[in-house]
Amino acid sequence: IAKFLNVSPEIAAAYHTQFNIDFPTDFTKLLRPEAVELLEYLKDLGYPMAVASSGRLIRTMNKLDQCDLHKYFDVVISGEQFKETKPHPEIFLHTAKQLNVDPEDCMVIEDSTMGITAGYNAGMCVVALRDPRFNFDTSLATYVVDNLLEVKQLIHKK
């Protein structure tokens, strides 16, 4: 954004912060209707779960707070913590370590080319969540789904 606006990263960050204050996002309207059902299912089966977002931690926490999703996740990781971000696998490898799970035993659900690539580079099973509004590359995904509930069948294949 800084490069696009031809300003310093600090000024771009200040613009971004002010924009989010002036125009807050209602994340409950963006939450997929089937998301809570899948999270409940996975939690009931005892799977450790995490959020590994390349976004800012404060924004990620805001999303989780608004949608009342904190209770499902054991770990919340932000890309701000790392030198490299997606598509670099560091964020996913760190998250697996925090969960005490081997990367090859992890399933990543992603909705972006960068995230899919990061999961692939981390050696994880990658589920690409297709969205007709966005055309992104799913070629590195292990599976491609249109609905999160499809993941229920996939976890038994892994």
Predicted regions and their residues:
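Conserved phosphate-coupling serine/threonine residues in phosphotransfer and NTP-handling enzymes
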Residues: 53-55
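Hydrophobic beta-strand core positions in alpha/beta domains
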Residues: 50-51, 128
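A short, conserved alpha-helical patch in the ABC ATPase nucleotide-binding domain
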Residues: 1-2, 64
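Metal-dependent phosphoesterase signature
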Residues: 2-37, 45-47
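A generic structural signal for short
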Residues: 26-27, 48-49, 80, 104
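Asp-based, Mg2+/Mn2+-dependent phosphohydrolase catalytic module
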Residues: 40-43, 57-158
